[in-house]
Amino acid sequence: MNQIDLQGRVAVVTGGARGIGWAIAQRFLQSGAQVVLWDIDAQELKQASKTLAAVADPVAGAGVVHGQCVELTDDAAVARATHDTLATTGRIDILVNNAGITGGNGLTWELDTEVWRRVVDVNLIGPYLTCRHVVPAMLARGYGRIVNIASVAGKEGNPQASHYSASKAGLIALTKSLGKELATRGVLVNAVTPAAAKTAMFDQMTQAHIDYMLGKIPMGRFLEVEELAAMVAWLSSEECSFSTGAVFDITGGRATY
């Protein structure tokens, strides 16, 4: 594993109690950061914090993990979480907007309206709200790294997943706009567009859709969460210094543009 220096940094990872978020949190801890998990599931959050604490090696405040239960689609809840995190850690250097849902699969005209709205709320409105409250704290210090976990579905549009694809396309556009707005302020904003990784999100999909996604990947396998965590770690570091509003592909050759 290549060493990426996040020593002394404070990172917020949304949806950090499982899957991709957990792997990112683990990589951050191994790189010396303090990590704050924001997640809606209190039980999984408690377990993840405990497991990650065992991975951490606290030295001078590094490798510390905190957990906070947050409904990321609620503006007031995100405001409180931001306030509480700043009160606990003193600052937020890194924000990873990872929390997301698929909403199942179905033809666009047959998908439930409320499910469609919920997917957009979690996958797009949630990251907007976290940026809305965290960015001012980053600007006050003149430094920040924001990484949005989008999806190749946002670039290509997956059939029978219009709600998910549209929400991730919106997140890509949010990244581009915010990246331009903050380009001269010391806060860099980038997105990653991974192919599918085997996580609990597969439980929300049909087997036919899972097979479709695998068939689109030239490397013939799904993404490993550790591979994505490695890319996110670099994007969250000072070494990422001249990329903002950009979209980084990690799809095993599916998207080469």
Where are these regions (language model features)?
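Active-site helix of classical SDR
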Residues: C131, S167, T175
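Short C-terminal tail/terminal secondary-structure segment
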Residues: M1-Q3, T102-N105, E156, A233, ...
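Substrate-binding pocket helix/loop in short-chain dehydrogenase/reductase
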Residues: G106-T108, D112-R117, F202, M213
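Residue(s) in the substrate-gating loop at a strand-loop-helix junction
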Residues: S151
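Short, small/polar-rich loop/turn modules that mediate ligand/substrate recognition or access, typified
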Residues: A183, L188, S243-G245
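Alpha-helical segment proximal to the catalytic Tyr-Lys
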Residues: P136, K180-T184
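The beta1-alpha1 cofactor-binding region of Rossmann-like NAD(H)/NADP(H)-dependent oxidoreductases
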Residues: A42-Q43, C69-A81, T113, E226
